[in-house]
Amino acid sequence: MIKKILISSLLLFLIVLGLFWLSAAILLFIVTYSIISHYIKLIKHSFLKKTIKCIVVFLFLLSSLIFSRMLILDLFRIPSSSMENLFYPGDIIVVNKLKYGPKLPRSPFDIPFINLAFYNNKNALSRIKSNWWNYNRLAGTTNVKRGDVFVFSLDISRKYFVVKRCVGLPGDTIKIIKGEVYANSTLYNSPETVKNSCNFRLKNKKKFFTIIDSLKIEENLIYDNSSPNWASGIFSKHELQILQKMNCIDSIKKNIDHLNVAQEELLKTTDSRWTLDDMGPIIIPKKGMEIDLNPDNFLLYKKIFNLFENSIIIQRNGIYFIDGEKETTYKFKLNYYFMMGDNRKGTSDSRSWGFLPESNVIGKVQCVLFSNKNK
């Protein structure tokens, strides 16, 4: 009786959250297992009964594990330092796929454990970068919000997953001015973990070195022997606040990037001279948004036209052709996001590789399971 009440409460709770599909899936699992268990009890041969029961239990446990990893929760390893001081290389994070709704598999390679059989098949392996099925996503409990940190696949490859922070939503206009991000003309309040390169003048050297030793950030410091009272380093907002409160530095100046990154590696328009710290304005594509086809828009969005929108757009003498038809405008099929790493000078993000399509979003980071912070 208590078990039935608990199950009913769980199913009702999931329905209230809008997860009808999960409630139905759990109910289907329970009903199927109950029916099979009923027929197993009718078997008179004890050894056969135990064998079949063990096989059924194993298959249900395996199915539950596959279902959970594919649609509910999964574990990922942080591959780089792009999100320091929030995550560190080698950290194991728990990713919640229910937040934005789980993306359904687009090929057998997206299905845990089942994909092992396809990795050993040469014909299937030749199609590992292809989408076998159309993009679909089940209902989630919320939408992506500015400031969310989530895991996504960087391109159509199924081997490379990264984690970044969302600073721009579909339809937003993003502008970066002297390293500060503005969304729709409003300054984005970066979290305390965001790191930037700074120059600063020391007021109290002894206290300064004591503090940076406690913060374990001495390896980030660079000293100028010709100016002994000046130093530079990579600090998070939180670390800078500590240094300022302790009254050991006199002034701070953020290092602004001036064409230190080749233009070919950045988002750009026809006449832009954008840098990592000065860029935009950039309109993030939104599903149904229509743009004029002109040299600036073509240069800014051409990667996603062909790679994610599955539209072949060709420019000939100032005239644009979409799938062979002459057009003057284009309507986007997907929503896109603008992603940035918290380690602003130690990350490759949307400033270089462009916009992230919603179809590549895996799930929101829920927590850190194992941390390498002090290793």
Residue ranges and their predicted role:
Residues 1-375:
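Extended hydrophobic leader/signal-anchor segments used for secretion and membrane insertion
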